[in-house]
Amino acid sequence: MPRPAPARRLPGLLLLLWPLLLLPSAAPDPVARPGFRRLETRGPGGSPGRRPSPAAPDGAPASGTSEPGRARGAGVCKSRPLDLVFIIDSSRSVRPLEFTKVKTFVSRIIDTLDIGPADTRVAVVNYASTVKIEFQLQAYTDKQSLKQAVGRITPLSTGTMSGLAIQTAMDEAFTVEAGAREPSSNIPKVAIIVTDGRPQDQVNEVAARAQASGIELYAVGVDRADMASLKMMASEPLEEHVFYVETYGVIEKLSSRFQETFCALDPCVLGTHQCQHVCISDGEGKHHCECSQGYTLNADKKTCSALDRCALNTHGCEHICVNDRSGSYHCECYEGYTLNEDRKTCSAQDKCALGTHGCQHICVNDRTGSHHCECYEGYTLNADKKTCSVRDKCALGSHGCQHICVSDGAASYHCDCYPGYTLNEDKKTCSATEEARRLVSTEDACGCEATLAFQDKVSSYLQRLNTKLDDILEKLKINEYGQIHR
């Protein structure tokens, strides 16, 4: 356990005059003093509030207060790191039971704080006519040991040297050697002075110096405490730094007020963070915004934009990657392809099976996922690449007929023979009939006439055939026109 610092004693002259200072005087009711306010009847910030409820038995949480160690509105508030020094009056006017109440008050405040080297550090300065530093800021780093040390503190003697106590705290407790943090750390330096009497030394100048050095002073007055002196010791604004209770029996109720004072509100819980997606508490009332998976934080550090997952080239899509508004993505396929079950690769569609190809005769799937149209034998594909027209095989000259090729209406043809000839079994070649052979081979005098007669007969046959062919071609044209405009 750290060794207590030696008490600081007054000059001999003051000690000789001390009995005169202790003569009892008529103390008017503090409530009746001009300008004296009962601060326990006011809420935070000086607004009207409830009076403290009657004191609960030791160890039991008072009605309307939080349990020790649990912040009111748990989760909303986290204590800020502080260098905190309690300056407690233990003069003879503070009875032993009342001094116990003061220690309970100190312990209750400690319960609401996060204690540790990187969190709040606590020291206690005990004073009466002398001043004693019970333990320094660096002495205890855990809450249990700290509260045990508070419990071991004993009262000193007569006298109320509040100014000397503040000076001692400033010179010896709030130093780097004693455990205070460097000014560059921006850790607040806070002193809470608890007294029930009028200071017997000057407090205004020493309090002003303490405040000028960066120490924030809170003054808690009990019973016959002098309000003017409390105001001289406390920092501005006074309505936030001066407290008063009528008896030590209710002083511990003020612990909740200090809990609110030292609380760093969590904007993430309060809903004031303005983060579009996720709010992360950093402690000390600070926070930062983060984004859900698939999003990135914008320059304003509050709103989020979807990541371009497709641009990252990690999507695995075989054909096309499409960003979604949700910050994710999905795969699509080129025209003529369909997405496989793995939702990434693509397979060519069977456009012909879908029945949407528009081919008049035959639809053929291509390897590219597309298709093309073809026509039945004897037909040719039109310029629209979908419809078909009858092909004139006789005109193509590939029919193989020896004499005459006759086109049929079904994109086919058949062979015919000149008059005097008959079609052979191969349906292509012709052979002269017996009559024709006889007419051609005659050598008698009538042969010339017979030849002329044969020629006339052949000419007549040819004329009839030409007429028949013209009729057939006309019918084919009409049929083809009807198929194109169907």
From Swiss-Prot:
Q: Report the protein name in the record.
A: Matrilin-3
PANTHER family (alphabetical): COLLAGEN ALPHA, MATRILIN-3
Residue numbers carrying Omega-N-methylarginine: 198
User: What positions belong to coiled-coil segments?
Assistant: 456-480
Please give the start and end residues of each transmembrane region. Answer: none
Q: What would changing residue 194 to D do, according to UniProt?
A: In EDM5; retained and accumulates within the cell
Q: Which Pfam families match?
A: cEGF (PF12662), EGF_CA (PF07645), FXa_inhibition (PF14670), Matrilin_ccoil (PF10393), VWA (PF00092)
Q: Could you say what the effect of mutating residue 128 to P is?
A: In EDM5; bilateral hereditary microepiphyseal dysplasia
Cystines in this chain: 268-279, 275-289, 291-304, 310-321, 317-331, 333-346, 352-363, 359-373, 375-388, 394-405, 401-415, 417-430
Expression tissues: Expressed only in cartilaginous tissues, such as vertebrae, ribs and shoulders.
* Residue numbers carrying Phosphoserine: 441
The biological processes this protein is annotated with in GO are:
cartilage development; extracellular matrix organization; skeletal system development
Q: Where is this region: Disordered?
A: 32-75
Organism (species): Homo sapiens
Gene3D superfamilies given for it? 1.20.5.30, Laminin, von Willebrand factor, type A domain
Q: Which GO terms describe its cellular component?
A: collagen-containing extracellular matrix; endoplasmic reticulum lumen; extracellular matrix; extracellular region; matrilin complex
Give the record's keywords alphabetically.
Coiled coil, Disease variant, Disulfide bond, Dwarfism, EGF-like domain, Methylation, Phosphoprotein, Repeat, Secreted, Signal
